[in-house]
Amino acid sequence: MDAPERLMPREKMLKSGIGSLTDVELLALFLRTGVPGKDVMALAHETLQRSGSLYGLLSADFAQFRGTGIGIAKYAQLKGIAELARRYYKARMMKENALLSPEMTREFLQSQLTGEEREIFLVIFLDARHRVIKHSRLFSGTLNHVEVHPREIIREAIKLNASAVILAHNHPSGCAEPSKADKLITERVVKCCQFMDIRVLDHLVIGRGEYVSFAERGWI
């Protein structure tokens, strides 16, 4: 069932720009129509409430959509949007050959690690001017653990002639707070890199709609 025109966010977007839309309005714009007994704004609001956030929505599996009125076609489109965002940030980083700000770094890492069901440890390798040489998913693990080998990071950095690295991994559980093991492995990597005159600029832990930066907390 279509929402009345006054409820559609399309006019608001055309008048004030896409950035003026709330998360609910943006989702309603994507959904276009509601379902019997529920207009599109109500459907969008309920769907976001169930998933907790846009992050939760885009990383959810299809089982979580059952009973919402969103079918397999819309689910596939949502997953496509998430993948487009991931590839956009990757293409942007590779084109500009740089991460120009902490915010851009965070957004890129969130786009790469959001929705992963296992812990992934990713490393960004940078040259002496902090331009991106390459980023690699060096290690993958289980739901709550990933085995990290500092020597593999060093080997790749030397091969690429990197002067600095940024570390990142995700917590599929959603909580970005670093564990004791996260802190210990970061210390090990930092010490190994210092020995080879390679700087560790940061280690970001990506959770569900949140993150923790070791550099921002003064741990690096």
Curated annotation (Swiss-Prot):
Location of the motif JAMM motif: 169-182
Single GO molecular function: metal ion binding
GO BP of this protein: proteolysis
Binding site residues for Zn(2+): H169, H171, D182
InterPro entries: MPN, RadC_JAB, UPF0758, UPF0758_CS, UPF0758_N, UPF0758_YicR
Keywords: Hydrolase, Metal-binding, Metalloprotease, Protease, Zinc
Domain MPN per the UniProt entry, residue ranges: 98-220
NCBIfam families referenced in this protein's UniProt entry, alphabetically: PRK00024.1, radc
PANTHER family, A to Z: DNA REPAIR PROTEIN RADC, UPF0758 PROTEIN YEES-RELATED
Family: Belongs to the UPF0758 family. YicR subfamily.
Protein name: UPF0758 protein CKO_05095
Organism, scientific name: Citrobacter koseri (strain ATCC BAA-895 / CDC 4225-83 / SGSC4696)
